[in-house]
């Protein structure tokens, strides 16, 4: 059967100004890709992290490891997914007891070389400072692919005490897993992470992050 399909594909023709010509392999691939794309089931998964205080030690979260293996609409059937869209709803509020303004940095990135770990913030940045550059060794090896890197101020005033953003990423990427569970040990190539860091030693800003993923099984 496979031989017959291959033979038919090779004999497929297309119409051009000069008449009928054999279809190229690229033409056949595009047709097959289109048919398969229409038949794939698109899945969605949501994650809502609890309110968190951000200080000079920072926080880092994996945004893809919560997609566990299973048969549900929010689960994956194997060890690879095609991530098509990621929407982040990020809210941050300066602590009301703080009389001084503060800076907050947040970064969204892929770990292209992950092997079952949660990276340390100092794997990403050269120091625990809002103005720090990227850690040089991992930057040299192109370990991380950065999708967003922002620094903003939260002022101790009624006009700039809180901020909220909806961040949409439509970059398509294959995310790999090494296990079935929601655990750091399941993280593999192209796991997506969120890093947040402030310049407040104490009474840092409080943040909350909601995540929605749209994906297909690979």
From Swiss-Prot:
Pfam families: TNV_CP (PF03898). SUPFAM superfamilies: Satellite viruses (SSF88650). Keywords: Capsid protein, Virion. One of its GO terms (cellular component) is viral capsid. InterPro entries: Satellite_CP-like, Satellite_virus_coat, Satellite_virus_coat_sf, Viral_coat. Coiled coil: none annotated. It is found in: Virion. GO terms for molecular function: structural molecule activity. Residues 8-17 have a biased composition (Basic residues). Residues 1-26 are annotated as: Disordered. CDD domains: STNV (cd00259). It comes from the Viruses. This is Coat protein.
